Amino acid sequence: MSWFERGLLIWLLLLCLPAQAELRLVLQPAGLSELQRSASQALLVEARRSLPPVLVSRLDSVVPVRWSTALDAEVVGRASATGAVLLNYDRLAALTAVDSEGAQKASRKLLLATLVHELAHLYDRGRYVSREQHPLLQDCQSQQQSLGLIGLPARCRGQAERQFTLSDDPRLLDLAGWPEQMGERGAREVTNHQRDRSPDSYELASPSEFVAVNLEYFLLDPQYACRRPALFAYFRQHFSWAPADVQACSGSYPYLNASLDPSQQALGRIDPERVYAVHYLLAEPNEAWASRWGHSMLRLVVCAPGRPRGPDCMLDVDQHLVLSFRAFVEDVQLSSWDGLTGNYPSRLFILPLTQVVDEYTKLELRSLSSIPLQLNAQEREGLLQQAAQLHWSYDGTYYFINNNCAVETLKLLRSGTANTTLRNLESITPTGLLALLEGRGLADDSVLADRDWAMRRGYFFDSFRERYQVMFDVVRAHLKVPSERVEDWLALGAQQRANWLNMGDQRTTAALLLLEQAAQRRQLLLVRQELKERYLALRDTGHAELNQTEQLMRQLLAESGYLSRPAELLTAGYGLPQADEWQQLQQRSSERRQGLLDMAGSLDEQLLALLDAERRDEIEAGKHNISLLAERLRELHRAGGGLQLR
């Protein structure tokens, strides 16, 4: 065989081999100088190098890139309907500036992000489906055609009508801030309420813009993995790839403690390695119209430092945290109309469990049930990530009927765990949601079967109403008091109760002390209600003392907003705060907390001044009774030979 025949054969064989399909960015050089062409080509090479291999191989076409004079001044670039990328010609001068290295660097960074952004749009519009996804989409489309929306399996919600690669993926929409509306068979919310600490507010305009903006940060920002860990994991899984220069993350998630207890740290970190379990925490219903179906929360069972994860972590109650969606009410009066029409923000409060237990069992006299959720380690980790993300970004709208605590909690469980069993659960009440979770095997209520055991192990926190009745039964067994029910005893005036305070033995006196403390708490609640009614009656009437008090009250309510919206404490950055923002967070949270405590002290003084003399006397008499009982208990203890601490 001659060299000519051999060469021809090789050439024919090469023609038969499949070409390597991949994206090619081709500069349109018309009208550009040599310097401009060189700078533009370098930009395209850098953009191409930053893209995931999967994206490059799927976008297997020539994408023309052209500098355009037709774009508005504020538009840096745009992907055209024909598949080309247009860059604003006005930005070219800064890219080629030889006398300003800073301007050139800033321009290159902006143009690089723009190129990635527009290529992300092209990729999203391409509706690229992986080999693993294809059977699911085919099956879901077939089932929707035969069964319709009503009979569609949970795993098919949002899959059958897919038109894009990423921006209509149900998983991405959950993480991004377009969750499913309750009772709408998969229809998504129109508005994205994860608006705080956004890297670019343009991402909130639509899911397609969200994808483009976040692909910019996924590819170009080394901190993205730490600031938006759930979304980083989503893109990494989609592309089976991650950028090489990803920053190492701390592994724990920062949060702001919504408690104003001075003994508590204002800032904390949730370490997933210390979270043993997640419980559905239910406050029982009461007669108040806003609480008649209970209140749903999530309890994080956090182990004490050094304790291995296990059942004993249930004993570390002082470490446990509560995730509670609540309406942020910037007024003393809770309005049913405002609650029905969505005039209250819905926010995720993070509170110590001990405070939540006191709030419900002692003040509201409502019991709490803590039911373990059946989550695996991956679901638990995802839930913690999403809760932290919502804590720093979410400012929703609270509706008492269709976007209340139960709905918000269910949406968090869906987006955090990605458990498809949750997708077709529908409930707008806390008790109803618990029943559904139990019915699907996601909640284990067997821990409540033995009430005494449940109380000892921390699965049930009884209302103090029952405890008060037990204490009162002790009193009635030793003293001939005039009341039969504890409510009647607490309703007596402090001076009437004082007649019986010096008659009991040590056990009876201890019971009387607990009841007197309960009576004082009840009195303070009555004072709060009386002051609210007086305040509302005299508001806007020109009452001099009230005007000053009203101004302070409004300021206090407005200033307390940061407790549920911690993003207010930071002026820059996005997503979860990082180490370089921690010092600013500590300083500002400390200053704001002290300011609130000072205002609250001043407000208490002014409000007490508005009380009538009879109510003030009742409060003082209650304090006196508590002091007398405490002293008598010490005397009886000494007389009985009890241990004395010196």
Regions found by a protein language model. Give the residues of each.
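Activation targets extended, charge/polar-rich intrinsically disordered C-terminal tails
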Residues: 95-103, 125, 130-203, 213, ...
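N-terminal signal peptide c-region/cleavage motif recognized by signal peptidases
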Residues: 16-18
